[in-house]
């Protein structure tokens, strides 16, 4: 039986790659829905991007629901300098997808899919956690029916402020609510995602895969590589969000440690900081599993295999 997942995302180059890996022909994952949230770009642009990516994948069977257009409390903030004005700059995509998002809001879709599933559902969250927190606030009972939340966000250092990673910083109040939910949470932060850089050698490898999906990924990675060289002086783009799906596909690729995680949501200086108690100094019980290392070579092998299934 396939593992049932809901992908809550803000596509986003790395979100797009995560979608492609999850929806591959031989995937052991069943995508119940894709829900979008404001983050890398506006929720309208992110929704268009999700629909376009699913079109490229040939997965028009997967419903897309538009979610929160701003965080729980503070104004919206976008990452245009990283993902471009469209949120998926680089590839040429249609301005109007082949279909529209469903009418039901994302948080309602999350609640509905979780509560009506005959097996527990995994939430894969690769953007700000606004939709997930909203669903938990509106229907707390979903926590009992969620197998895990596997998310990209946070880390022991920052990329948007000196101490905060973008996804958590956008809506720290939502993140705090999620980490206090009691649900099993698998965290893929900058500590591990910065180990998986798609450099020129990786891009050349994927260029040899002769199908439209693989070539779309190449265009995504080329844009991301340039962006990360310009803004962070890195030799490749980290495939941040894809790590969530890679873990669900092949968990042995990652070293995970149980830790207590808390989210700072009050300090103007450190808002959005993820406090990861790696050394167990607080004495608080673990509420998450935190990725610390990854088998990079096997990551590229797995992605190569998944891209070839689209031939």
Feature-to-residue mapping (PLM):
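Glycine-centered flexibility motif
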Residues: 39, 67-70, 84-87, 153-154, ...
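Metal-dependent C-N hydrolase catalytic cores
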Residues: 3, 47-116, 286-296, 304, ...
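Conformational coupling and interaction surfaces
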Residues: 2, 18-30, 169, 188-311
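Generic secondary-structure boundary/loop-capping signal
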Residues: 69, 79, 85, 129, ...
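Short amphipathic alpha-helical patches
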Residues: 45, 77, 88, 137, ...
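Active-site histidine-anchored catalytic micro-motif
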Residues: 2-51, 86, 92-195, 200
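A residue-level signal for conserved active-site and pocket-lining positions in enzyme catalytic cores
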Residues: 64, 178, 245
């Amino acid at each position: 039986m396939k593992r049932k997942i809901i992908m809550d995302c803000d596509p986003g180059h790395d979100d797009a790659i995560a979608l492609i890996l999850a929806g591959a022909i031989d995937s052991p994952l069943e995508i119940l829905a894709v829900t979008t949230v404001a983050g890398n770009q506006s929720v309208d642009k992110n929704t268009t991007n999700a629909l376009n990516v699913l079109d490229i994948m040939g997965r028009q069977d997967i419903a897309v629901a538009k979610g929160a257009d701003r965080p729980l409390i503070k104004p919206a903030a976008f990452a245009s300098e990283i993902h471009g004005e469209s949120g998926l700059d680089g590839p040429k995509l249609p301005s109007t997808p082949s279909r529209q998002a469903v009418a039901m809001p994302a948080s309602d879709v999350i609640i509905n899919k979780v509560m009506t599933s005959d097996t527990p559902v995994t939430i894969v969250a690769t953007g700000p956690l606004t939709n997930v927190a909203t669903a938990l606030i509106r229907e707390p009972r979903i926590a009992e029916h969620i197998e895990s939340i596997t998310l990209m966000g946070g880390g022991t250092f920052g990329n948007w402020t000196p101490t905060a990673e973008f996804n958590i910083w956008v809506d720290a109040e939502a993140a705090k609510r999620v980490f206090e939910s009691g649900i099993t949470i698998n965290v893929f932060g900058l500590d591990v995602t910065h180990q998986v850089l798609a450099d020129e050698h990786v891009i050349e490898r994927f260029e040899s895969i002769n199908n439209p999906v693989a070539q779309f990924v190449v265009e995504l990675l080329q844009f991301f590589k340039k962006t990360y060289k310009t803004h962070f002086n890195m030799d490749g783009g980290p495939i941040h969000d894809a790590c969530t799906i890679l873990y669900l596909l092949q968990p042995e690729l990652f070293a995970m440690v149980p830790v207590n995680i808390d989210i700072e949501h009050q300090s103007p200086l450190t808002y959005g900081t993820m406090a990861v108690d790696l050394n167990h100094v607080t004495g608080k019980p673990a509420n998450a599993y935190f990725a610390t290392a990854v088998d990079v070579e096997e990551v590229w092998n797995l992605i190569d295999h998944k891209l070839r299934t689209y031939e």
